Amino acid sequence: MSASYWDSSQRNKWQYSRESLARTRQKLWMLECQLYPQGTNILMEGGGKDAQPVTKNIPITHRDLHYDRDYNLRIYCYFLIMKLGRRLNVRQYALATAHVYLARFCLKASIREVNLYLLVTTCIYLACKVEECPQHIRTLVNEARSLWPEFVPPDPTKVTEFEFYLIEELQSYMIVHYPYRAMEQIAAALRRPPYNLVLSPDDLQNSWSLINDSYITDVHLLYPPHVIAMACLFITVCLRSAAGARDLQETFNRFMADSQVDLHEVMDTIQDFITLYDHWDKYNEPWIKFLLHNLYLRPHAGGTTVSGAAAGSAGPAGSVLTPNGTITGSTS
């Protein structure tokens, strides 16, 4: 355990360069191609009024259901953690830790070989223990089942079993450092001379929201927390500057130059935000939910298969995607 990011396992064990992160994901990509060469078969409703459902194959080389390439999946995972966290009134720090656990886990394991909903539940359970705001496991499982009854098993021991698997994949490095505290420290430094720049509560709230969104991206696997905080504050100040506060932008730019923060890393982080919001405009939740229903609940012929235990379901249930984007034959 380390109180300093610079001596922490996050920096020494779980911080990647762009190149090393790409190599790590390429290994998982190759493994998925070997394990699931036939891809995933899905059942889609035919175009005509009386048309029969049609089976469609999604090749394994498609981006769908690959965490590193499928922003639909990333955004959906983010919403799953936030939804369950809010039901349990979990602190944001613990949810941030859960997001990092999930991102690290998805470097080592495919979504096709685990139950995503059980993974989300376990990440929150473990994060709450690490952040010293533990949740009773039965309460956690009951709330998770109220959201995703088909996917989360009623037996709490399934979560504890998955917890050991999660800890093993994380190599027992549990401590996570956040940009939230760095953002507060930067805001305090800006208030002091010679900058005398006071950010409004709305500015700080916008920056906080940007940090929340950053957990969908790779920046927490790439850069120190203070770089992410600086990028979020820079975006907030730019938005204020566009509204007419030019002096604010000039003062903040001077502060960034004086701070000696790596501006290339800050700009890379901002670019990740731009990429994220571009994909967010195209976010299609019914599609990713449908794919996960097919992956975990529907019996497959010649495609990806997931056992009932791994899916955490009471049994198979057929689901069909209709032309208007709704899912039939399911309750989630």
Curated annotation (Swiss-Prot):
Keywords: Activator, Cyclin, Nucleus, Repressor, Transcription, Transcription regulation. Residues 74-175 form the Cyclin N-terminal domain. GO terms for biological process: positive regulation of transcription by RNA polymerase II. Its main location: nucleus. GO terms for molecular function: cyclin-dependent protein serine/threonine kinase regulator activity. It is found in: Nucleus. Disulfide bonds: none annotated. Signal peptide: none annotated. The keyword Nucleus applies. GO terms for cellular component: mediator complex; nucleus. Pfam families: Cyclin_C_2, Cyclin_N. Component of the SRB8-11 complex, a regulatory module of the Mediator complex. Component of the SRB8-11 complex. The SRB8-11 complex is a regulatory module of the Mediator complex which is itself involved in regulation of basal and activated RNA polymerase II-dependent transcription. The SRB8-11 complex may be involved in the transcriptional repression of a subset of genes regulated by Mediator. It may inhibit the association of the Mediator complex with RNA polymerase II to form the holoenzyme complex. The SRB8-11 complex phosphorylates the C-terminal domain (CTD) of the largest subunit of RNA polymerase II. Belongs to the cyclin family. Cyclin C subfamily. This is RNA polymerase II holoenzyme cyclin-like subunit. It comes from Eremothecium gossypii (strain ATCC 10895 / CBS 109.51 / FGSC 9923 / NRRL Y-1056).
